[in-house]
Amino acid sequence: MKSVLAAAAMSLVISDFANAEETRGKAMMKIEPSAISEADIRSVSPALARFGREAITEDLWTRDALSPRDRSVVTVAMLIARNQPAEVKHYIDVALDSGVTPAELSEIITHLAFYSGWPNAMSAVSVTKAVFETRGVTPDALPDASPDLLPLNQEAEKQRSETVEKNVGRISPGLVKFTADPLFLDLWQRPALTPRDRSLITVSALIASGQSAQIGYHLNRAMDNGLSAEEAGEIVTQAAFYAGWPNAFTAAPVVGEVLINRSSSKT
């Protein structure tokens, strides 16, 4: 009996060690900055190959202000928003290897159809389909078309609807209608993404698109849903490489204002 218990205990130890090694391996996974190989990049621009290796692979993706999983989500959202299908395909693979599920990626594309436009989402669909086929992802691994929705925060929805009606009701009644349903009464209530993740990809897409006027509302919503100040700042850092320095610097003052206002309200 003692030998059986000892063997069971040893099995648990080995299992825990293996799981720890797997987790550590994921955390230390080398992220290639592009679908294009470093050798091919070097054949055109040795400096670009060096910056990609030193700044992106060896520095940016090793920073701990965002988890590898969240960093890949942010990057996929930014690339979809900027309609970069070749790089979307590469980073869909990175995201899957970093712990993002096929269901979450499916829902990210759905969400960004509204925030980056249908054509950008269709570009993402075409390349993601190929990745899913290669990895054997089947339809039953994807979110339902019409699932049971998350509970609605009635007070927040009332405030949102009144603000939208006041600001654009006379200008575009159709925009008011579709902003309510399907955007906030359906899309935002779908359970395939947590509210935090849904806000995370929205903020990332807005920063990547240079839509600074919309960042404040959605960043506040993201932080209400659990995004930290450090994570918010790191999204801007990630944007510098994947959406360009001008977009990062356009977003930085808006993000800073949100962080200052939230900090002041707590004192």
Language model segments and positions:
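Acidic, glycine/proline-rich low-complexity segments that act as flexible tails and inter-domain linkers
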Residues: 20-69, 82, 89, 93, ...
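Bacterial N-terminal signal peptides
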Residues: 7-15
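Winged helix-turn-helix DNA-binding recognition segment
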Residues: 100-104
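A short structural micro-motif
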Residues: 80, 98, 111-118, 207, ...
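Intrinsically disordered, low-complexity segments enriched in Gly and acidic/Ser/Thr residues
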Residues: 207, 213-214
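Bacterial N-terminal signal peptides that target proteins for export
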Residues: 1-5
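Short, structured motif recognition centered on aromatic/hydrophobic residues
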Residues: 71-79, 108-109, 198-206, 235-239
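Extended hydrophobic/aromatic segments used for targeting, binding, or gating
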Residues: 219, 225, 230-239, 243
